[in-house]
Design a protein with these regions (language model features):
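Short, acidic/turn-prone active-site loops that include or flank metal/cofactor-
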Residues: 1, 48-51, 121-122
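Short, charged, surface-exposed secondary-structure boundary motifs
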Residues: 3-7, 53-58, 125-128
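Glycine-rich phosphate-binding P-loop
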Residues: 1, 17-38
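Conserved NTP phosphate-binding and transfer environment spanning the P-loop NTPase/kinase superfamily
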Residues: 108-115, 119-178
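Extreme N-terminal, non-catalytic leader segments
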Residues: 1-17
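Conserved nucleotide-sensing/catalytic segment adjacent to the nucleotide-binding pocket
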Residues: 38-109
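Hydrophobic/aromatic beta-strand patches that form the interior of the parallel beta-sheet core
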Residues: 19-21, 42-44, 90, 114-118
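A general structural motif
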Residues: 16, 85-86, 112-113
Length: 178
């Protein structure tokens, strides 16, 4: 079975016509992908398969990530369900979604695919993220340990500012700053 999954992940991605939804965080790409699916479009939802939203704060509450092998089995099934004569929409991701690695053939196909860029004004993105990540804003203690992972990329002053915004639950400037 494992050999079948690995073959599937090598053979199918180059054979399908991927269209990438790209854009900044908070432009509702996943929601657009899901709406496209409801309207008959073929999609591969990597974030759903990986149980992770792809960002530092992307872990799903009460939903651990699957093993790499289980992710790959689910991905293989999702790819096998695609008609190669039709476009397949997929959200732009890095080659790692949380602890899950996107298989090399799919990653290469994604990098070569045509792309649709989704844009939204900053205020709309902030409002969307505040709603979509309500599980974090309702439990701020979850956020700081995650932000500490950014200490090598941001100054102590920036981390202190984020800490103050979190403590005041002043979400719009915190979200915009991230």
């Amino acid at each position: 079975y494992r050999r079948h999954v690995l073959d599937c992940l090598d053979v199918i991605p180059p054979a399908i016509s991927l269209v990438i939804l790209s854009g900044q965080t908070g432009t509702a790409k996943t929601h657009i992908l899901q709406a496209a699916s409801k309207n008959g479009a073929q999609i591969v939802d990597l974030e759903s398969l990986a149980c992770h939203r792809g960002s530092l704060l992307g872990s799903e509450p009460d939903k651990p990530q699957p093993s790499q092998r289980l992710f790959e089995s689910r991905l293989c099934q999702s790819l096998k369900n695609c008609d190669p004569q039709q476009h397949v929409f997929i959200e732009a991701e890095s080659n790692k979604i949380g602890n899950i690695h996107v298989p090399p053939a799919l990653w290469a196909a994604m990098r070569a695919a045509q792309s649709i860029r989704v844009t939204a004004p900053m205020t709309a993105r902030v409002n969307f993220l505040q709603r979509d990540y309500a599980h974090m804003t309702q439990n701020p203690a979850v956020i700081m340990p995650l932000l500490s992972k950014l200490k090598h990329r941001h100054s102590a002053a920036q981390l202190a500012e984020w800490d103050a915004l979190i403590n005041r639950q002043d979400w719009p400037p915190f979200i915009e700053s991230l």
